[in-house]
Amino acid sequence: MRRLPTREVVEMKMVVAVIRPEKLECVKKALEERGFVGMTVTEVKGRGEQKGIRLQFRGREVEVDLLQKTKVEVVVSDDAVDEVVEAIVSSARTGKFGDGRIFVIPVEKSVKIRTGEEEV
């Protein structure tokens, strides 16, 4: 019977942050300064506690219930989660409604498409 080489299992997490679009560059810089350069960024729409906003447009009141947001996703080892979360919070916070939310999600495995290499 052939034995497979043992590899150290590293717990991975995906940190998903929904932030104000104008805070993206600050968040990228804060993450890069701490050595976290890989990320996926998506422009999204959403709402939370504030349930949208009312604006004046050409003399009329307009309700916008889905606001422009930016989603930043970073996959890191379990022991780096707190550092990533702190970097995002400190660089994205304005103290006002609409600053966003951070979610931490377990990652079961990762497959590098180019090589097929799996990380568990």
Swiss-Prot record:
Subunit structure, as described in the record:
Homotrimer. Interacts and forms a complex with Amt1.
Superkingdom in the source lineage: Archaea
Coiled-coil segments on the chain, per record: none
Does the keyword Cytoplasm feature in the UniProt annotation? yes
Species assigned in the record: Archaeoglobus fulgidus (strain ATCC 49558 / DSM 4304 / JCM 9628 / NBRC 100126 / VC-16)
Reply yes or no: does the keyword ATP-binding apply. yes
What is the official name of this protein in its record?
A: Nitrogen regulatory protein GlnK1
GO MF, any single term:
enzyme regulator activity
Binding-site positions, ATP: T40, G48, E49, Q50, V75, G98, D99, G100, R101
Write down the SMART domains for this protein, in alphabetical order. Answer: P-II
The family annotation for this protein states:
Belongs to the P(II) protein family.
Query: What are the binding positions for ADP in this chain?
Result: T40, G48, E49, Q50, V75, G98, D99, G100, R101
Where's it found, cell-wise? Cytoplasm
Gene name of this polypeptide: glnK1
**What InterPro entries is this protein classified in?**
N-reg_PII (IPR002187), N-reg_PII-like_a/b (IPR011322), N-reg_PII/ATP_PRibTrfase_C (IPR015867), N-reg_PII_CS (IPR017918)
Q: Name one GO biological process term.
A: regulation of nitrogen utilization
- What function does this protein fulfil? Involved in the regulation of nitrogen metabolism. Regulates the activity of its targets by protein-protein interaction in response to the nitrogen status of the cell. Regulates the activity of the ammonia channel Amt1 via direct interaction.
Kindly give the Pfam families that the UniProt entry links to this protein.
P-II
What keywords would UniProt list here? ATP-binding, Cytoplasm, Nucleotide-binding
Q: Which GO terms describe its cellular component?
A: cytosol
